[in-house]
């Protein structure tokens, strides 16, 4: 018989930097989960990633105080800012442009995010990424 699920916890944690301090500790502690066990497992799985890159994770908590977790790809906005070489988007995205990315860069981001996007094909995924970039004040060349 399957274990009884008591809840899901969604967090964004920097790769390789999970520790018992907030937000990880309080979120897992409320459900009675082993915080250090999660931190060690998460840090081991994100070892090959760029340190500090925020990684969304969904933790499934079970009634017997065990858990499983699924990592998603980093947020598109973080990947877009990294590709454009900026630290934050424009406060007025439709009037003030703060950077630009090429279609090739948008395709690379779309391939990285493909598992998490609901796009039917790569071209639709690229258009989704381009829309996110435009809403941040970043122009997409070649689109």
Swiss-Prot record:
GO biological process, one term: translation
Quaternary structure note: Part of the ribosomal stalk of the 50S ribosomal subunit. Interacts with L10 and the large rRNA to form the base of the stalk. L10 forms an elongated spine to which L12 dimers bind in a sequential fashion forming a multimeric L10(L12)X complex.
Molecular function GO terms recorded: large ribosomal subunit rRNA binding; structural constituent of ribosome
Post-translational modification: One or more lysine residues are methylated.
Name listed for the protein in its UniProt record: Large ribosomal subunit protein uL11
Gene Ontology CC terms, in alphabetical order: cytosolic large ribosomal subunit
Gene name for this UniProt entry: rplK
One Pfam family hit: Ribosomal_L11
The keyword Flavoprotein is annotated on this UniProt entry: no
SMART domains (UniProt xref): RL11
Family that this chain belongs to: Belongs to the universal ribosomal protein uL11 family.
PANTHER family per record: 60S RIBOSOMAL PROTEIN L12 (PTHR11661), LARGE RIBOSOMAL SUBUNIT PROTEIN UL11M (PTHR11661:SF1)
Keywords tagged on the record: Methylation, Ribonucleoprotein, Ribosomal protein, RNA-binding, rRNA-binding
Function description: Forms part of the ribosomal stalk which helps the ribosome interact with GTP-bound translation factors.
């Amino acid at each position: 018989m399957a274990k009884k699920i008591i809840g899901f916890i969604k967090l964004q944690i920097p790769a390789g930097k999970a520790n018992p301090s907030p937000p990880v500790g309080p979120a897992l502690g409320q459900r009675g989960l082993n915080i250090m066990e999660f931190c060690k497992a998460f840090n081991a799985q994100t070892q090959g990633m760029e340190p500090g890159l925020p990684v969304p994770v969904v933790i499934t908590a079970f009634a017997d105080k065990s858990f499983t977790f699924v990592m998603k790809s980093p947020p598109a906005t973080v990947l877009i800012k990294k590709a454009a070489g900026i630290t934050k988007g424009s406060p007025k995205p439709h009037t003030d442009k703060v950077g630009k990315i090429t279609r090739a860069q948008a395709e690379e981001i779309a391939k990285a995010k493909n598992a998490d996007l609901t796009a039917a094909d790569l071209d639709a995924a690229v258009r989704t990424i381009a829309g996110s970039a435009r809403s941040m004040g970043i122009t997409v060349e070649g689109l």
